[in-house]
């Protein structure tokens, strides 16, 4: 997985940077380097998630509560949009009732969008700056990414794609589409 990715990135002329797996050192290095892409294991994303929550809650007294509310709104908004645009991991034919019902989901979207926008202004942009400010796509492999982390990062504007492969057979067999992600899945076979 890692070696195949390194060879590909070197082939296309991308600069590679390495850091220690300690989250505090990793976040400091990310601020210095401003990466656009990062391939890691789910444990690193879990550590980044915990560092984000710790950082937000330590800033002001009520910041943690507001961050939780705005994160909930952004996650709910993203989930509703996934249902509306048929980006769910259910693999059966949609009924007429489903198509009619999905149109009514625009109503809560209208009410949730301002909360997501406020959260983006005050919190989510700061979180993206913790990752260097230019971060575009994070790749997770080597284990299943917990759905909670997948929803969190995608809802605050950090796209994660999940890949699957065995080093012994084929380093990367499947990878999620970054433009139309279906959360909780590993995507199509390459």
Task: Locate predicted features.
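Conserved coil-to-alpha-helix start sites within the AMP-binding
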Residues: 1-12
């Amino acid at each position: 997985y890692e070696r195949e990715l390194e060879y590909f990135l070197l082939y296309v002329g991308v600069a590679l940077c390495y850091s220690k797996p300690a989250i505090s050192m990793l976040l400091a290095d990310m601020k210095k380097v401003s990466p656009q892409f990062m391939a890691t294991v789910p444990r690193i994303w879990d550590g980044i998630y915990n560092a984000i929550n710790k950082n937000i809650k330590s800033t002001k007294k009520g910041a943690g509560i507001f961050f939780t509310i705005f994160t909930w709104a952004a996650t709910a908004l993203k989930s509703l949009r996934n249902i509306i645009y048929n980006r769910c991991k259910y693999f059966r034919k949609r009924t007429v009732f489903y198509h009619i019902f999905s149109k009514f989901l625009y109503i809560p979207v209208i009410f949730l969008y301002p909360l997501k926008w406020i959260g983006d202004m005050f919190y989510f942009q700061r979180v993206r700056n913790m990752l260097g400010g230019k971060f575009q796509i994070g790749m997770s492999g080597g284990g299943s990414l917990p759905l909670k982390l997948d929803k969190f990062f995608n809802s605050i504007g950090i796209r994660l794609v999940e890949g699957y492969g065995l080093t012994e057979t084929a380093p990367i067999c499947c990878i999620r589409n970054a433009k139309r992600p279906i959360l909780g899945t590993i995507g199509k076979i390459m």
